[in-house]
Structure formats: structure tokens, C-alpha cells
From Swiss-Prot:
GO terms for molecular function: rRNA binding; structural constituent of ribosome. The gene is rpsO. Part of the 30S ribosomal subunit. Forms a bridge to the 50S subunit in the 70S ribosome, contacting the 23S rRNA. This is Small ribosomal subunit protein uS15. One of the primary rRNA binding proteins, it binds directly to 16S rRNA where it helps nucleate assembly of the platform of the 30S subunit by binding and bridging several RNA helices of the 16S rRNA. Forms an intersubunit bridge (bridge B4) with the 23S rRNA of the 50S subunit in the ribosome. It holds the Pfam family Ribosomal_S15. The lineage of its organism: Bacteria, Pseudomonadati, Pseudomonadota, Gammaproteobacteria, Alteromonadales. GO terms for biological process: translation. It comes from Shewanella woodyi (strain ATCC 51908 / MS32).
Length: 89
């Protein structure tokens, strides 16, 4: 239920500041968003998978906290990121 290596590499190339950037806030939020979108499709088929649903809620909360941090520290990068990812904020 995780992303494969090609998907991860494409996200790193699109959102990373350099080629080995895996820890910046933008990359972390983009990876979490891709995993959340993947799990949403999983739950359409497996409605009673409560164990994975708990993991999904943890990912959503982590993404929310990272976005709040980015908005508080660098609002311009925050606005660009949510526009690229198509988030509702």
C-alpha cells in the first residue's frame, strides 16, 4: 500500500530543491499526499479495513501539521505547494 520507487522518484524530482532532497517540508507533504490519495482508492474497495484507516488518519494529521508549519514560516512556498498539489486550503 505504499508508493513504488518510480512514483517516489518523480515526486522527489518535482518537489525537491536538489536531487537528493528527501526531507524538505514540500517533499514530505507531496509524498504524504500521494500516499493518502492511494489509500483513498484502497478504501473504496475495502471498506472495513480499520487498521489501514488508522494509518490514513495519522498521515492526514502529519500532513496538516507540516502544512501549518510551512504556512507559519514561509507563506509563499506554502501557497505554491497547495496550488501544485490541488489541496483545498
Amino acid at each position: 500500500m505504499s508508493l513504488n520507487a518510480e512514483q517516489t522518484a518523480s515526486i522527489l524530482a518535482e518537489f525537491g530543491r536538489c536531487e537528493n532532497d528527501t526531507g524538505s517540508t514540500e517533499v514530505q507533504v507531496a509524498l504524504l499526499t500521494a500516499q493518502i490519495n492511494h489509500l483513498q482508492g484502497h478504501f473504496k474497495e475495502h471498506k472495513h479495513d480499520h487498521h489501514s484507516r488508522r494509518g490514513l488518519l495519522r498521515m492526514v494529521n502529519t500532513r496538516r501539521k507540516l502544512l501549518a508549519y510551512l504556512k507559519r514560516t514561509e507563506n509563499v512556498r506554502y501557497q505554491e505547494l497547495i496550488k501544485k498539489l490541488g489541496l483545498r486550503r
